[in-house]
Each structure stands twice: as C-alpha cells, then as structure tokens.
Amino acid sequence: MSKLFQDSNKRMSRIVDYDEIKFDPLSIIGSGGFGKVYQGVLNGKEIGIKKITISDNDPNRDILLKFLEREIYTLKMLSHPNVIKFYGIAEKERSLFLLTELVSGGDLHWYIKNKSIDITWKLKVKIARDIAASMAYLHENGVIHRDLKSTNLLVAENWVIKVCDMGLARKMDKSEKSKMTICGTDDWMAPEVLIGEEYDASCDVFSFGMVLIELITRENLTPRIRNEDLGVDQKFFLSKVPADCPKELLRLVSECCKVAPSGRPSASNILGLLEYILESELIVNSGGDYEPPLRSFKPPELHLPLNEKNNNNKNNNNNNNNNNNNNNNNNNNNNNNNNNNNNNNNNNNNNNLGNSGNIYDDFSFPRPYQPDDSAVDNINNNGNDDSHFSFPRPYQPGQSNINGGVNNNNSNDESHFSFPRPYQPGQSNINGCVNNNNNNSNNNNDSHFSFPRPHQTSVVILNDRGEEEPLVVSQKDQLEHDLEGGDDNEEDEMKQLKSQLNYSKFSFPRPYQSSKIISFNETELLSFPRPWNPESEENNNNKNNNNNEKSLLEDPKYSFPRPYNPDSDSNLSFKSTAKVITNPTPLTTTTTTTTATATTTSSSSTNSKVTTNSTSLPTTTTTTTTTTATTSSSSLSSIGKPPQSTYKVPTTINPSTSQRVITIPSRIVTSTATAQPKSRSNSNPPKPTVVISNSNNNFNDIVKPSSTIVNQNKTTTQPTTLINAPQKVTTPVNKQIQPLHKSNESVTVAATTATTPTTATSTTIKSSPTTPTSTNQNIEQIKITTPKDEDENKSETNDGGGDTVSHRRSRSLDIKNSTKAIIKKFEELTRFSSQQSNLVHQPSSSSSSTKQPPTSQFLQNPRMEAKLSFAQETLVFEKSPSTSPKSLDIPTSSSLTSNSNSSIPAPSSPTKKTFWNKPKK
C-alpha cells in the first residue's frame, strides 16, 4: 500500500512499480487540478502520467489527500468509452503518479476559443452526445462529477470526448438529495450549489447546459451570462447566438439551464434527444462529416545531434584560443597551450551544458533566460544564440570580466525571434580586460523583430535639373544634404554638427530636424490662421508691391477673422430698415414780432340779435417782439397727438390802440396742417384756430373749452392787439350763479366755479376805451365754461399748461351754423333778462358810470342777478349800470383767480342770490 494512503481503510489496487514507468520530466503535455501531466510509456503503451506532489508541511494536505483518494477510487470502478480509462498508481519520494490513457488532442476549451478551427453544427451535436453519454453513465452508477466544464473534457482521436478529472466526483444515493460541499467552478456551477442548498445529479445537467452555451457561442463564459436568479440571461445569450444555430440546441439549452432543479431533464433523456437528432438528420450540415485535425503533443528531443555539438565546441575553442593569445602575449607558448587546454576543457563542459539547455528544438517548452554562472573567469555567453522557438527574453548586456577574464560578448547577434529591445551602447571593460565587443559592427544590422519605432517618412525633393520628378531619399541623406547646403560662415559649425550625427539603425528614432528655414509665405495657406497685424501687413504689402506679388493675407478668406481696419479694409455696406417715429423736438427760443390788428364790431337789431363773426388778423413783422415756443416732452406718450405749444407775442401798443389779450389753447386741431406745424421758425408761427362745436339735441350743445369766440363790434373802428399767453383756470364742476346787471348800453355774461382751481387757458378780449357806445345793448363780458368730460378714457391732461382737454371729435366744423346757435342763446338770455327786469325791478340810474363795479357788488344787488341753464350749462349774465365801454372776457374754464390778465377778480366769499321770484298776483 502507498505510504500516502496507509491510514486509509480503502483498498488501493492497481499499484504499479515506478521503475516500470518511463517518461521524460520535460515532456509536459498539460496540467490538472492537482499537478502536471506528462507523456510516458508503460509496458510499451503510451500513457498519461499525472504527477501529484503533496508536501508534509502543506496546510491543505488532508483535504488534498481526501480528494485524491476519492478520484482514484472513482476512476478504478468506471469503464466507459467517454470516461478516461484508469491504469493504476505509482509512488516515489512522496509523490503520487496516476496512470491513465493518453488523450493527445487536448481539452475541448482550446478548440472552442480557437475560432480558426471550423467546428460544424453536426460535430457540435456529436460532442454534446458524447458528454451526455458520459454523464448518463456516471449518474447511473451514483456518481456526481460536480466539476463538469470544457477544460475537463478531453478530445481523443476521431473527436471522441472523454471526461476526466474526477477529483471532485462524489458517489451518492440516486434518489436522495444531500447537502454537500460547495465545489466546482463558478461559471459552470448550478444555482443551488452556489447558494449552498441541497443538490443532486441535476447540478451536472446545469453544467452541461453551460458547456452547450460555450459550443454555440464559442466564447468564454462570463458573469454577464447569468441573471439575478443565477440562471441564464436568455436575452444576452440569444444576442450571441449565430443565425444558423439549430433550434433544437437552443431549446435544449433552455431546458437544461432552468433555475429549478426539478424542471431540468435527466442525462438519459438528453442522450436520447441528441441521438435522435443525429439519426434523423434534422441538422443540415453543409460541411458533411468534416472533422478538423487534432492538436498534436509530440514530446521534444532532449539532445542535439553529435555533429552539431562538435561544431559548436570547435567554434568555442577557436574563440578561446584567440582571446588567450591576445591576453598573454608575454607568456611562453607552453603556458599558452596549457592554459588553452585547461580553458578548453572547462569551456567544453560548460558549453555542453549550456547548449543542451539553450538550443531547443521546434517543440521545446518556452522558458526564461537563465545565465550560466559556473564559469566566472572566462564567460562565453552565447545566451542570445536563440533557437527559432526560444522564449523571448529581454536584452542581456555584455557582462564585464570581473576577475580579469576574457569577455566575448556576442549579445548583438540577434535571432529572428529575440525579444525586441532598444539600442544598447557598448559596455566598457571594468577591470581593463580585453573586451571583444562587437556592438559597433553589429549596431547597424537590424533584426526583423528589433525594438519598434515610429514611422519615418521619406523626404521628397527635386533633382538638380529642376525637373518635377521627385527623388525619394532617406532621412539621413536629406539631413546631410541640408547640412552641406549651409552658408560659408556656418561651414565649421555645420561640420561639427555633422560629425556628431552618428546614426545607428538601433538608435531610438528622432523626429526630423531640418536646418533649412522655411519662409512664412511658402506655407501661408497651410499655417494656422492668425489675427491681423498692421505692421507686418504694411511690410508685406510694401514687399509684395516691390516684387509684384500679392500678399496671401490680403485675401480675408485665408486669414484669421480679425477686427475691422478702417485704413486697409473697404467700407462696410449693409442695408437696414427702421420704422421712423416722428418725435417733436423741444423748440428753442426764437424772436419774432407780430403786430395784429383786429376790428371788432357789434350790432344789434330791433329784436336784440347779437351777431358774432370771426376776426380777421392781418399781421406784420417788426423787430421789437419775441415769440417763445415750448413743447412738452411728455406729450409724446401718445403718438399721433400734437404737442402742446404756447406762443406769446408781446407787442408795443400805440397810444390810440387798446390792448386785447387772447390765449390760444395748444391742443385745438381743426386740420392736419395745424396738428403738427411744419415749421416753428420766426417766419411761420402757427396761427390761432377758431373752433366752435355745436349739436342740435343733446347735452354737448355747448362751446368746447378749446373754443375761441371773437365778437366783432360794428361800431368799433380802431384795431386791437392780440397777446397770447397761458392762463390758469379751474375745471368747472359746479357752476355758481353770478349777479346780472342790465342796462341799455351793455350786457356782461360771467360764469365762475366754486371748486378748487386747476390749470387751464383763457381768452380775454378787451375793447378800446375810445370806442363809442351804441344805443343798442353792448355785450361787455361773456364767460363760457363747460363741465368736465364725462368720458374719463377720452380726457387727457396737457402737460404744458395743465389743462384738462377733451379730445372729442367736433360734431360740426361749420362756423356759420355754430355761430347762429350761440347768437340764438344770447338772444334768449337778453329777452329773458329784459322781461324780468321790467316785472320786478326798476332800471338803474347809474348806467353812465365809466368804471365797472367789482363782482362782489354784483352779488350784493339781487335786483341785478339773473341765470339761465341750457344743455347742462349754467350761464350767469348781468347788465352793467354803466354805459362806458367794458372789456369782454372769454375764458375756456371757470375760474380767473390765477389769471393776471383777467379784468374781473374772483369773489372772495361768493354769496348765492337768486333774482327770480314769482310775480305776486
């Protein structure tokens, strides 16, 4: 019994003597879970030998022995074409050797990942059938493999699959589940094994489904193939499936990889399905019964032929003799021969050992470089004389002779498969020994697999004849050409630089550096665009003008976008459209003189009709008066409305001419010509406009506050002077009744308000004192006020004078009809007042007084009061007892308290008195 299993109760049969086994320790064909696999011979039959070594100090010794014992026990009881055959075990020096049949094709995983091997669908079904047959055989014998995967499936001749590596196999009852050790490989393990639940033989079915996924997709399994339930992600799996995959295989994968163990088919059912598919030829295979060749594992030849060894020894001896002769020129020939013989003997032994290890055949196992340190005095390092399949290794620099020996460094004799390395400069001999270093001679000999370097483009130049055929020269020749083309003054410097340029093909590549200075104009279009520079532009323009060449930067298409330069750039032309809104500009003060003469006449007929006509105003220009025109900027708030303007024309009054003051409202418009004057110059001031509005049947049958009434007295012969000035009046709300004074000579009509005064404009007309009185009744004073506009949305405040002006459209612009309506009202007033005076009061005897009494006196005399309301307008009129000519005021608002030009002061404490009393019967 084996010493390893001497404590085991199981009988270890089939024990083979180690001396019966013949194998080379270098003939490794693979590795398993517990050791390496070698190719050997047992009784003239090729076998596979699995070497397992377990040291006494290994902490997992007991576990490893347990699984090893289980594998041996399982293999010796199994015999199936799809299960690897067991021959016995052997032991030597605490190592155990498992003897099995030799499967030279390798594992299935190597064929799956190597996509250059064409595996048809029919062959894949055959592979799946063999795996299912082995699995059904194991399950029938109560064995669970628990580590079924593609690396544990070997490919024998004729593509027969054999299951191996039974180290984790476990014999158990077929009908019961048990909680066993979590073992296996994660990518192939069933969900119940991963989470530590009880499992049975169905775990091998899940692993079989994962092997089918490898066969179909021919890709390595990754955790991405599993979903959150530890099953198979069908969506991801189907994305990797080829288009020509048989549906039967996809259905089989879906059934085998179910999460629930009870839903998976048994191994025997899987085997029957696959055999049915192969027999019925359900899979159409274009390749027929093609089977790709298998992977071969021929053991390597361990030694070189004798003639090749002798040639190597002779070369080494000659090299050593030459080196020794150079080192010992002062010694005798006998000493040289003795030294040569001794050195040759040592070198022969060392070289033979080195050559046997360094020069491999085509199937040697790759291994790293191992320097030979046995010969210290004389190192013949032939490590770089590699075979075609030697392991690639880094560059080993020439080792210096520490003890004064001879150093033959042939490190630069590179093989075609040597490790790529950068340029290594020659090493110096540390102790002054002779160093036959061949680096300088071999530096320029590039191997095909030398250190990679970037691509060096060739330079294209023109030949000396100026032809367009380019000459392709190397980088070195171009650089030398540039260096030789320098100036005479720089010849010494260029030669010195040229002497320093010792290029080697082993040197690290450097970018091309040309000594030629390329002008900017030659590469202008390819250079980076730059901003405009005025100084360089001028210099370039001057230079180009001299050379009759056009500057490249002159064209803005190739220059960098730059700011506009008014000196050199052309004028910018662009079209723009704008909606022009006329904004009145504040007018400056100008001077003008206007002398106006107005003739005012009044006449009365027998039925006491008063005739009022418009006043003709012939004007003349002098040099002594000024006109001030102001426009409020706030009037621009409403477009289309004319600005307020006030024109004030003071004049010099002749002694024989009385002064008449007329205030013209600024917002009175009767035509478009007067809405916005064309000119505000001295020669064309806006003319006052007379607007009288009247209606027939509603409450608007009144004179608007913007109206100007001019009465013409027929008896007046002397002209009057017009003075235009802004006045402040109050906006009437409630009208007060003023006393009425009636005489045979004059009639004065006045209206005032009792509310808070506001700004407004007024017009006052004063007649000449020299005007002779008429026997008819003369209208001395007329004041007409209107109530505030009831439509608040249509009213607007005049910013210049503060007037509250109504902008209602004039109902009639016919002056004749409007004048007739006013005259009719005055006739009714006059007739009514005359009747009341005759009935109640006596005529006043003081009618010849020349001075008009104040308004307060009128209020105290009830005998002189009268009132009449029409069209929501209250008119208070009075008859003056004096017959002297009085002034006529026509205000546009109700109050004259703030008007300095008013002839009648406002009453301080007005008292309401009514003259009307019913006549007593």
Curated annotation (Swiss-Prot):
Location of the region described as Disordered in the Swiss-Prot/TrEMBL record: 289-453, 465-492, 530-571, 583-653, 671-698, 737-813, 833-858, 877-921
The keyword Ligase is assigned to this record: no
Ranges of biased composition (kind: Low complexity): 310-352, 400-412, 429-445, 539-550, 583-638, 748-775, 842-857, 892-910
Every Protein kinase domain range: 23-277
UniProt GO BP: signal transduction
Record keywords: ATP-binding, Kinase, Nucleotide-binding, Serine/threonine-protein kinase, Transferase
CDD domains: STKc_MAP3K-like
Molecular function in Gene Ontology: ATP binding; protein kinase activity; protein serine kinase activity; protein serine/threonine kinase activity
Binding site for ATP: 29-37, 50
InterPro entries per record: Actin_reg-Ser/Thr_kinase (IPR050940), Kinase-like_dom_sf (IPR011009), Prot_kinase_dom (IPR000719), Ser-Thr/Tyr_kinase_cat_dom (IPR001245), Ser/Thr_kinase_AS (IPR008271)
One GO cellular component, as annotated: cytoplasm
Catalytic residues of the enzyme: 147
SMART domains attached to this UniProt entry: S_TKc
Coiled-coil boundaries: none
Swiss-Prot/TrEMBL catalytic activity: L-seryl-[protein] + ATP = O-phospho-L-seryl-[protein] + ADP + H(+); L-threonyl-[protein] + ATP = O-phospho-L-threonyl-[protein] + ADP + H(+)
Compositional bias per record (Polar residues), positions renumbered to this chain: 643-653
Enzyme Commission no: 2.7.11.1
UniProt similarity note: Belongs to the protein kinase superfamily. TKL Ser/Thr protein kinase family.
PANTHER family attached to this UniProt entry: CENTER DIVIDER, ISOFORM A, LIM DOMAIN KINASE 1
The protein's name in its UniProt record: Probable serine/threonine-protein kinase DDB_G0275165
